[in-house]
Design a protein with these regions (language model features):
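Active-site-adjacent structural elements in enzyme catalytic cores
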Residues: 2-265
């Protein structure tokens, strides 16, 4: 059952706050968590009812798939049906970090995460709070940005509270996000990698690890939907770096450095 009014807790990112967030996720509730990119609304990715609450809270179309967050490759069993070689190269180069890799979907991912697709987006966040909650809960979690659909992506707990108070169970306040833009999304399920969304890793940097990356393309005369890619508003050349000024206007307080492997620690 989805409640329409909730007394949203705001918890510090200490041991007690992490334990409370993990408990709520195991109970099928929604919790906003900091990542290195932006704050996300997390739900157990194997619990379809919990994942459905995300769409209600955000006012997000259900045909827009969600990204599943894990701590590392050891959690991929059941979430993906295979790990393509290019995915392995990208994970070795950039994970944990602000990269989402589209892979063939496994049987344990809730259908609600995937919007009818046979693929799933996988990300391994580097933020210590997000990782601690995954480990404490034992849950891979689906987590889009913790804002109302169409609003700027939140980079502080205060931003999340403004949009999500009364709609989710809890917010874990881990301070401002370091990267401040969403993860780069690369699809490795085709003949060559495709950029679905620019973000914290530049397309040229990703291409160096996985081979030349093509643009998001259309099928049947319409743009491919999902994972926030349609919001970029323009194409990014596969060999040219992402310029911060192209995206800063879409994010509250996005001022941190764009990601490089040296910043992962």
């Amino acid at each position: 059952m989805i409640r329409m009014s909730i007394n949203t807790e705001v918890r510090p990112a200490d041991a007690e706050g992490i334990a409370r967030a993990a408990e709520l996720l195991r109970q099928g509730e929604l919790v906003a968590l900091p990542t290195e990119t932006v704050y996300g609304i997390a739900a157990d990715a194997r619990n379809g009812e919990a994942v459905s609450k995300i769409f209600v809270a955000k006012g997000r179309p259900q045909d827009n798939p969600l990204i599943v967050h894990v701590t590392g490759p050891e959690m991929l069993h059941g979430l993906v049906s295979e790990v393509p070689e290019r995915a392995q190269l990208l994970m070795a180069a950039f994970c944990p970090g602000p990269l989402t890799i589209i892979m063939p979907r496994g049987p344990e991912v809730a259908a609600e995460c995937c919007a009818g697709l046979d693929t799933v987006g996988i990300r391994m966040p580097s933020h210590p709070v997000a990782r601690a909650v995954i480990e404490a809960s034992g849950c891979a979690f689906a987590a889009p940005s913790a804002n109302l659909s169409g609003k700027p992506s939140p980079t502080t707990a205060q931003h999340v509270y403004h949009d999500m108070a009364g709609k989710i169970e809890a917010i874990v306040d881990g301070g401002p996000c370091r990267v401040g833009v969403e993860s780069t999304i690369v699809d490795v399920t085709g003949e060559r990698p495709r950029l679905l969304r620019p973000g914290g890793i530049t397309p040229g940097t990703a291409a160096g690890a996985a081979g030349r990356i093509g643009h998001r393309q259309s099928r049947g005369g319409r743009n491919l939907r999902g994972y926030g890619g349609s919001r970029a508003g323009h194409e990014i050349h596969p060999l040219y770096p992402l310029r911060r000024r192209d995206y800063r206007h879409r994010h509250r307080g996005a001022g941190g450095p764009l990601y490089s492997p040296a910043l992962r620690a």
